[in-house]
Regions:
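Alpha-helical bundle segments that constitute or directly flank the non-heme di-iron/ferroxidase center
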Residues: 1-28, 50-61
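Short amphipathic alpha-helical segments at helix-loop
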Residues: 2, 40, 81-88, 124-128
């Protein structure tokens, strides 16, 4: 496992989120392709919460106290409980990027951590550090794809011309 590469990817993907989300208008960051789908505002709120309360917290837990159970989280419930749609888009984006930088700094500063540690999850079995770090990178990629689809969907929703010249989506 190339943990340096994965940590670098987290930094790079933070820059990707910054580039994809900076400068969006309220119409753009609130646009949804369907009522049950997430908009960019909900995605960045989710990423902010996940950065602090899921991946980083759980990786820290497995590294330091693998025998203790994970703190329970409920990301789907957070959307309404934390009123994602009422959040300040630019503010939450800035807070997410600050948290991401903190995560990268923390990971980069670890000195000989016990990467072989694993928490024995009662439902999914062993959850080790490499699984958490790799899935953090994969989670970013999932939401980058989701944001790309949102941006394309928004463009097609406001366009008066066909999009097939650009290629098949």
């Amino acid at each position: 496992m190339d943990r340096i590469h994965l940590t670098t990817q987290l930094a790079v993907q933070g820059d990707v989120f910054r580039a994809m989300l900076s400068g969006l208008t309220p119409d753009q960051f609130r646009w949804k392709p369907a009522p049950e789908k997430w908009c960019a505002l909900e995605i960045i709120c989710h990423l902010y919460d996940e950065e602090r309360e899921d991946f980083r917290a759980r990786l820290k837990s497995v590294l330091e106290t693998p025998e203790l159970p994970f703190v329970k989280i409920d990301p789907p419930a957070w959307v309404s409980e934390r009123k994602y749609m009422t959040q300040d888009f630019e503010g939450i984006l800035k807070r997410f990027l600050t948290e991401r930088e903190s995560s990268v700094t923390w990971l980069s500063g670890l000195k000989d951590p016990p990467w072989s540690n694993a928490y024995l999850h009662p439902k999914v079995g062993p959850v080790n550090c490499d699984l958490l770090l790799t899935n953090r990178v994969a989670h970013d990629l999932h939401h980058i794809r989701q944001l790309n689809n949102l941006r394309y969907g928004y463009l097609t929703s406001i366009s008066t011309v066909p999009m097939d010249y650009a290629g098949t989506w």
